[in-house]
Amino acid sequence: MERIKELRDLMSQSRTREILTKTTVDHMAIIKKYTSGRQEKNPALRMKWMMAMKYPITADRRIMEMIPERNEQGQILWSKTNDAGSDRVMVSPLAVTWWNRNGPTTSTIHYPKVYKTYFEKVGRLKHGTFGPVHFRNQVKIRRRVDINPGHADLSAKEAQDVIMEVVFPNEVGARILTSESQLTITKEKKEELQDCKIAPLMVAYMLERELVRKTRFLPVAGGTSSVYIEVLHLTQGTCWEQMYTPGGEVRNDDVDQSLIIAARNIVRRATVSADPLASLLEMCHSTQIGGLRMVDILRQNPTEEQAVDICKAAMGLRISSSFSFGGFTFKRTSGSSVKREEEMLTGNLQTLKIRVHEGYEEFTMVGRRATAILRKATRRLIQLIVSGRDEQSIAEAIIVAMVFSQEDCMIKAVRGDLNFVNRANQRLNPMHQLLRHFQKDAKILFQNWGVEPIDNVMGMIGILPDMTPSTEMSLRGVRVSKTGVDEYSSTERIVVSIDRFLRVRDQRGNVLLSPEEVSETQGTEKLTITYSSSMMWEINGPESVLVNTYQWIIRNWETVKIQWSQNPTMLYNKMEFEPFQSLVPKAARGQYSGFVRALFQQMRDVLGTFDTVQIIKLLPFAAAPPEQSRMQFSSLTVNVRGSGMRIIVRGNSPVFNYNKATKRLTVLGKDAGALTEDPDEGTAGVESAVLRGFLILGKEDKRYGPALSINELSNLAKGEKANVLIGQGDVVLVMKRKRDSSILTDSQTATKRIRMAIN
């Protein structure tokens, strides 16, 4: 305080002020400090000092033609003296004001497009809600997070090619745009940025923000998706947090979230099929997430999650070298071990064959809600330092570490038999048996473990067998810490192999991942996941099976139509109709099938009775083994929404509704697609137009082979005959004309002849 008072007194004397303001600085050290090097040492001061001058700015000489010498108030805007050392003009800051007010204006249309990520960020903040501030200890752990909301997931190289193609299309250099996303983005951006006057370099920077994922290794407590990370500085400090709900979502977070859900669903479904690996690959290749192919997303998206990594491994992609156990990611930070098979007896005298890891090792364990450091020797836990959000999370981590340690007292704590099975009803391996057992009830494990007195160490406390904190005693080797353990920061990826049962191993044969590690958590995906594989239709329940079955028929209508008329049995046996059978009441399946097949046969026999909508509607019912009966049905029942709903054979119903005006089909109120051909148009327009250049000779003639679809006609040689399936399911015999005739007469004759051939 004394010194401050003294200073105040000194400053009140005018002499002190004079010395400080008037004295020249001539101390060599100071001069050196401020003049050596090109780097500005005091930018703020320099700016103030420069702006205090009359003409601190230089401009191109052309400015003299574009700006008056004086503004409305008569103040001088530019000086006639040249800037020393360049041929530029000295300009006053007032010139900038004049330019901003009166200078030429350009179109602003491109700004929101180029600076899209900024405009969107402002929108999210504007519509976001900030809640109360809470003061409490923050357990932050460093995680690799996405800091750039709203980006696509291109690799740096792919993005570079897109940017060059969009911003500098005439530059030399090979650019290969191969992936679908590259082509789509390039096309979109070229259209958006036509006649864009913004500096190309700026456009390139902004495009990079939009195309490439940027990650940083940051301390985070709470949400890790990019819309939370962009406000990290507003939502968490060292001892406080502010509640926040983002005012919008961004596609990249949605992709990450939906990818995890799709991968989990696919792994779970693959596990129960006859060949898990083949099924998994089939599903990954036929699934789309938000309109993008899942395999393309897997190749580009760095998300590390157990199910996602299993899918990546199946595709031959590299994954992180850490391994997963009990939902925690383990990364060995030091030590090494060798594996040996050993037999042990549980407390229930059941024999377990366990692969024991012999040797001293240290691991970090990172989970969603708890993290830990584990030091262990052969079948012995030396030390476990845990931190977590709450008692429950800490307990989860302790159980996993105790099982992982393979200690004898853990194995002896087992009561009852271990017979846990996976989804495919196969027994789990011994380590997962133990894990499941103690996850259900760990009381005996904690009680048998033993406690020890503890020293007072800053930031650490003990935890008792009933999971309450203590400063005197703790579970043997276990401590709870206030600070979290950082996630493994390296982005290194390794080559792995995967076996038929989806167990992923590194090159030394260590199991990194297996389906047992895939979380059972169910979530709702943010983006639409379209599982084209019929194996996945059951995933979202009966409604999804219904919608997907009809969507599949409509998507493949061209081929379905031909099979329907030529080879119905093959069509009825398609695997795509299997899930549908579970919706049809057991007792009625055979009868419905017999009825529908008979109806279809009648349509084939009587020309002109073909009815697209009816075939699509009834086809799935024909897949069950038919019962021959004379029964007729006016409606068929399907079990959806917890009860039987009716599909009307000759009309619309809430389950199956075809709108003639829009030509669209809705199934249970969901759009199932459009019929490309009009089922009600008789046979006139479409066919006559398509059959240009063909003569219709009459009804189908089997000698000329199976019916072709209209698209296949183009392969016929002149004068060649063929049966062709026209829109209404009728088959007629045609011949390719020998000469190119007038289109008009062709269409008219075609129409007449189709009518004659059919009637």
UniProtKB/Swiss-Prot annotation:
<keyword id="KW-1262">Eukaryotic host gene expression shutoff by virus</keyword>
<dbReference type="InterPro" id="IPR049115">
    <property type="entry name" value="Flu_PB2_C"/>
</dbReference>
<keyword id="KW-0506">mRNA capping</keyword>
<dbReference type="Pfam" id="PF20951">
    <property type="entry name" value="Flu_PB2_6th"/>
</dbReference>
<dbReference type="Pfam" id="PF20949">
    <property type="entry name" value="Flu_PB2_3rd"/>
</dbReference>
<dbReference type="Pfam" id="PF20950">
    <property type="entry name" value="Flu_PB2_4th"/>
</dbReference>
<dbReference type="GO" id="GO:0003968">
    <property type="term" value="F:RNA-directed RNA polymerase activity"/>
</dbReference>
<dbReference type="InterPro" id="IPR048298">
    <property type="entry name" value="Flu_PB2_CAP-bd"/>
</dbReference>
<keyword id="KW-0946">Virion</keyword>
<dbReference type="Pfam" id="PF20948">
    <property type="entry name" value="Flu_PB2_2nd"/>
</dbReference>
<dbReference type="GO" id="GO:0042025">
    <property type="term" value="C:host cell nucleus"/>
</dbReference>
<dbReference type="GO" id="GO:0006351">
    <property type="term" value="P:DNA-templated transcription"/>
</dbReference>
<feature type="site" description="Avian adaptation">
    <location>
        <position position="627"/>
    </location>
</feature>
<dbReference type="InterPro" id="IPR049113">
    <property type="entry name" value="PB2_helical"/>
</dbReference>
<keyword id="KW-1104">Inhibition of host RNA polymerase II by virus</keyword>
<dbReference type="GO" id="GO:0006370">
    <property type="term" value="P:7-methylguanosine mRNA capping"/>
</dbReference>
<keyword id="KW-1191">Eukaryotic host transcription shutoff by virus</keyword>
<comment type="subunit">
    <text>Influenza RNA polymerase is composed of three subunits: PB1, PB2 and PA. Interacts (via N-terminus) with PB1 (via C-terminus). Interacts with nucleoprotein NP (via N-terminus).</text>
</comment>
<comment type="function">
    <text>Plays an essential role in transcription initiation and cap-stealing mechanism, in which cellular capped pre-mRNAs are used to generate primers for viral transcription. Recognizes and binds the 7-methylguanosine-containing cap of the target pre-RNA which is subsequently cleaved after 10-13 nucleotides by the viral protein PA. Plays a role in the initiation of the viral genome replication and modulates the activity of the ribonucleoprotein (RNP) complex.</text>
</comment>
<comment type="similarity">
    <text>Belongs to the influenza viruses PB2 family.</text>
</comment>
<keyword id="KW-0945">Host-virus interaction</keyword>
<dbReference type="InterPro" id="IPR049106">
    <property type="entry name" value="Flu_PB2_N"/>
</dbReference>
<dbReference type="Pfam" id="PF00604">
    <property type="entry name" value="Flu_PB2_5th"/>
</dbReference>
<keyword id="KW-1157">Cap snatching</keyword>
<dbReference type="GO" id="GO:0039694">
    <property type="term" value="P:viral RNA genome replication"/>
</dbReference>
<keyword id="KW-0507">mRNA processing</keyword>
<dbReference type="InterPro" id="IPR049110">
    <property type="entry name" value="Flu_PB2_2nd"/>
</dbReference>
<dbReference type="InterPro" id="IPR049111">
    <property type="entry name" value="Flu_PB2_middle"/>
</dbReference>
<dbReference type="GO" id="GO:0044423">
    <property type="term" value="C:virion component"/>
</dbReference>
<keyword id="KW-1190">Host gene expression shutoff by virus</keyword>
<protein>
    <recommendedName>
        <fullName>Polymerase basic protein 2</fullName>
    </recommendedName>
</protein>
<dbReference type="GO" id="GO:0039657">
    <property type="term" value="P:symbiont-mediated suppression of host gene expression"/>
</dbReference>
<dbReference type="InterPro" id="IPR037258">
    <property type="entry name" value="PDB2_C"/>
</dbReference>
<dbReference type="Pfam" id="PF20947">
    <property type="entry name" value="Flu_PB2_1st"/>
</dbReference>
<dbReference type="GO" id="GO:0003723">
    <property type="term" value="F:RNA binding"/>
</dbReference>
<dbReference type="GO" id="GO:0075526">
    <property type="term" value="P:cap snatching"/>
</dbReference>
<keyword id="KW-1048">Host nucleus</keyword>
<feature type="short sequence motif" description="Nuclear localization signal">
    <location>
        <begin position="736"/>
        <end position="739"/>
    </location>
</feature>
<dbReference type="Pfam" id="PF20952">
    <property type="entry name" value="Flu_PB2_7th"/>
</dbReference>
<keyword id="KW-1195">Viral transcription</keyword>
<dbReference type="InterPro" id="IPR049114">
    <property type="entry name" value="Flu_PB2_6th"/>
</dbReference>
<dbReference type="InterPro" id="IPR001591">
    <property type="entry name" value="INV_PB2"/>
</dbReference>
